Amino acid sequence: MEVKTMLLLLYPRCTTCQKAKKWLDDNHVEYTERHIVEDNPTYEELREWYSQSGLPIKKFFNTSGLRYKELNLKDKIPTMTEDELLKLLATDGMLVKRPFVVNGDRILTGFKEKEWSDALL
């Protein structure tokens, strides 16, 4: 059975992503890094990760980001279908909550040290 390396999607200039990456390195957690904007998640990936995660779809959105605010998504999300939301996320990596971790069937959005410790160490 092939063991997949953990995937870390991040935006390199994001300070939270930098902290998360440092935390992973300090704790000797192996990962493959992927630029969330240059190689944004596809619709298929997002659908799979969403179904695996058990998280509400809003947790996948970067709600403090400029694009989220520009598109007035706070008001639009409640009126959109799950499929529409996943397609929207796939159009722009800046809409996706970061850092974003895929570790087998475990999905982590944002960097919360306690949550990451419990899930990854």
Locate the predicted segments by residue.
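A short alpha-helix capping/helix-coil boundary motif
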Residues: M1, D25-N27, S64-G65, K76
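Intrinsic disorder/low-complexity signal
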Residues: M1-E2, T91
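Local sequence-structure signature of Cys/Sec-based thiol-disulfide redox active-site neighborhoods
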Residues: E2-N27, Y31-I36
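Thiol/selenol-based redox catalytic cores and closely related redox-interacting motifs
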Residues: E38-L121
